[in-house]
Amino acid sequence: MSEGKSKPKSPRLNVTLAGLRLRTPLVAASGIWGYGEEHARSPQLRHLGAFVLKSTTLRPRAGNPPGSRTVETPAGLVNSIGLENPGLDALLADKLPRARRLDLPLIASIAGETVEEFAELAGRLADADGLAALELNISCPNVEKHGMAFGADPESAAAVVAACRERWRRPLIAKLTPNVTDIAEIAVACENAGADIIALVNTFTAMCIDIRTRRPLLGGNFGGLSGPAIRPAAVLRVYRVAQAVNVPVIGMGGVWDAEDTLEFMIAGAAAVGLGTCLLADPNKPEEIARGMRSFLRREAIGSVSRLIGSVQLNPG
């Protein structure tokens, strides 16, 4: 380097969503790394922008029946865990205090069987220290509507968001299921009910059958498909939702490398969730962050935030 010339600045990966300042747009998705205990000392944490804790219910849940809970597919993973978790009391007394060691914005994820349960969960977490935001897992079944997911229709989704909004004053995230006819309509309903951020997509409903026994391979019969197989479908839904709402979007679904991450951001995501890839390779955050910086440097783009929603559709 010649005398007098300063070293070029590294491209910036920091983003801000509804007041949440993330050092990178990479978010560890709920359920992948649990409550973070096993990763508290991992150098990978410095490449993440936020950490979403495993979904918590009001009472402990054992999850789906014993037997196979995951099945690998040619380009993904089908899981049927059944929201196994120790319950809210254990989260407050044990899991959350431990998670605070992660030195990352922590996002709690909650799942209820009724609107009232969601509201109670939000209310009891409202005074908890160390939580930057609350994610509503509205892909779980509504027992008052015969097991239909809360996120399957705008009215139910909005009811959950509105009830939690009354109890929770920090950023509120609605995480949407893709197993609907019009996900943008549901996203708008959540925004109107008070959601500060929309996250999508959760897994796609799936089934795997053993052709010899003629029985499902999963102990719970049905599961959720994640991994690279769903990425193009997830990108489309992120694009449609980002076009429909005026709040930030967290995109996810099949992210595997820096190119996938940037694709979601160009489609409209302000941050990107990492899920199945972390199971395959826990070093993915560093690899993806490095790849993003390399791309930005080559393209002479100073900040990744400039790419958010920059897609230009072909004419016609």
Where are these regions (language model features)?
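Alpha/beta catalytic cores of nucleotide-metabolism and tRNA/nucleoside-modifying enzymes
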Residues: M1-K7, L48, L225-N246, I250, ...
